[in-house]
A protein has these predicted regions:
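Glycine-rich phosphate/adenosyl-contacting loop at the front of the ribokinase-like
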Residues: 1-60, 67-69
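Conserved N-terminal subdomain of the carbohydrate kinase-like
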Residues: 26-27, 35, 50-114
């Protein structure tokens, strides 16, 4: 497989699991929390790399700690970071994910950021 250039988003997934999804106004005690890389562009880049491609990702990040996580994960996954763009005003994107641990149903709020 040849060189692949992926244009797309990078967001930091902030995922929590609980016994059920909260209804408006309800607070639910969660059972677990995970933070990790996500976003359509990043996920496509990972898949292309696993299929044997030489992958670079074009995405925009904020100048924040989540950008460092993005850079580290891209390098760890063997993807080039030479095409990363940075915003001085906007933060790196985030996805707030709440997962029902019994049914696997979820609710997601995306803050696109940079």
């Amino acid at each position: 497989m040849g060189k692949i250039l992926v244009f797309g988003s990078f967001v930091v997934d902030l995922a929590s699991r609980g016994s059920h999804l909260p209804v408006p106004g309800e607070t639910v005690i969660g059972s677990s929390f995970q933070m990790g890389p996500g976003g359509k562009g990043f996920n496509q880049g990972i898949a292309a790399g696993m299929a044997g491609g030489d992958v670079a990702v074009v995405t925009k990040l904020g100048r924040d700690s989540f950008a460092k996580l993005a850079e580290d994960q891209l390098k760890k996954s063997g993807m080039s970071t030479e095409h990363l763009l940075y915003s001085e005003q906007d933060p790196t994107g985030t996805a707030l994910i709440v997962i029902d641990e019994n049914s696997a149903q979820n609710c997601i709020m995306i803050v696109p950021g940079a």
